[in-house]
């Protein structure tokens, strides 16, 4: 893996996580000011973003992959699993945790995913635990905690259902990151993410069809927010996150995903004029620290390269 590929991988995951966080803040404004249903927004953004990604693929040389992925039972089955247990599960479990509790707890529990990814790769003997792994995981958990709670434990007092959904969200995010690798070995990231979004959106559409909304009450501003959530908060965010796995290991990608709550909090402070506490500054420094550690990390050694290849080979066999 050369330095330029690694830099591009860092660019993709940082941009993707940032867009996801900003998109979450914009979505929050839609929920609060326009009373848009969560399930409607998730269904609509998945279906629309998925179709746009596949349309992009049709303008590329390897456009045949859009149909080719469905011609083989193995890849078709993998894509269905990824769309339902990966793409849809990440969205639904996270939203369910918010519904039963609050966004702080939901996000904190979802960011157990880097720990789950590292434990999985250790158990499969696909990597070794390093001092950097321990430092970055601690920084991710501490950083997210301070960012989302400002050091107040009162926000962590939620019903058991919120905790269960939050933990499931963490496992779903880990599965999403690990499972994608096998598909990326065979198909372009546009194809993988595009079809996964359509599968997830179609399944959720049975609960809340995208046409069930009072469109007349929406203003031009609301439509602009919805468009932003679809293009940047969904399409770019998920595509770039998955594409980064072509150049980075799953544990690096999942750790850098902690930029999502940082970008969400910063956007809330700057745009929605929310206060930013002293403990949140500590959290921000922790998250920035992760980015610097991984960005300044030298290009992987041959042993690291082999561990990444092992993950991909195991993923191919397991799925």
Swiss-Prot record:
Q: Name one GO cellular component term.
A: plasma membrane
Major localisation: membrane
Q: Which residues cross the membrane?
A: 8-28, 36-56, 79-99, 103-123, 134-154, 163-183, 187-207, 222-242, 255-275, 276-296
Q: What sequence ranges are listed for the domain EamA?
A: 18-149, 171-296
Q: Which UniProt keywords apply?
A: Cell membrane, Membrane, Repeat, Transmembrane, Transmembrane helix, Transport
Q: Note the SUPFAM superfamilies from the entry.
A: Multidrug resistance efflux transporter EmrE (SSF103481)
Q: What is the annotated localization of this protein?
A: Cell membrane
Signal peptide from the UniProt entry: none
Superkingdom in the source lineage: Bacteria
Q: How does it sit in the membrane?
A: Multi-pass membrane protein
Q: Which family does it belong to?
A: Belongs to the EamA transporter family.
Q: What is this protein called?
A: Uncharacterized transporter YdeD
Which gene produces this protein?
ydeD
